[in-house]
């Protein structure tokens, strides 16, 4: 309900009909953080059947007067977000960590990685994917650079970012600590990959396209919680 757009207080009102003594909105928020972190121990280690292109992009946030960034990497075929992180700065080390996670999730399937024109991506992709350089002519990937101001960026990842922006700007707790913001965004990634259906992939979730053998039940959140405990 939370990631679908319902506020914590609206969820509280709903739960009071069933559990009046255990439904304060602060308790609900702690559940969201707890289970997002719990499920991520499972989902962060899954491998997917991807296409041949990944797209990486960043979103700027201002939290408590500071500039922060949400960086995500999407498989353009299945729409599956293969890696993401909420961070204080776009350092080479931070970006490399996210792209390495994308490489781990997709294995050797990727041929193209598309990014914007941010300086430093060449170094990041060299570290994470072995990008071809003057000294390494056996690179398995091509770095496709798209300058947003010149040609526009990929509408698939732009739609994802519009969805995230619309939701996070009103989220209670998102503007608190870095750890809470990171957990909330991890939950958003899980919701996007495993729960939310997409018209662009015939009404399926990205996980149904990318991990068809997973075969989740109707209550996908509960299913993922149980799987993360095994």
Predicted regions and their residues:
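Mobile genetic element proteins and their domesticated derivatives, centered on retroelements
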Residues: 11, 28, 57, 79, ...
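Active-site beta-loop-alpha junctions of metal-dependent nucleic acid enzymes
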Residues: 33-34, 84-106
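An active-site-proximal beta-strand-loop segment
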Residues: 56-72, 76-78
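Active-site proximal helix-loop segment of RNase H-like, two-metal nucleases, encompassing DDE(D)
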Residues: 158-177, 195
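Conserved beta-strand -> loop -> alpha-helix junction used to position metal-binding or nucleic-acid-contacting
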Residues: 118, 129-162
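Short, positively charged, Gly/Tyr-enriched micro-motifs
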Residues: 1-54, 58-64
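Acidic/histidine-rich, metal-coordinating catalytic segments
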Residues: 109-122
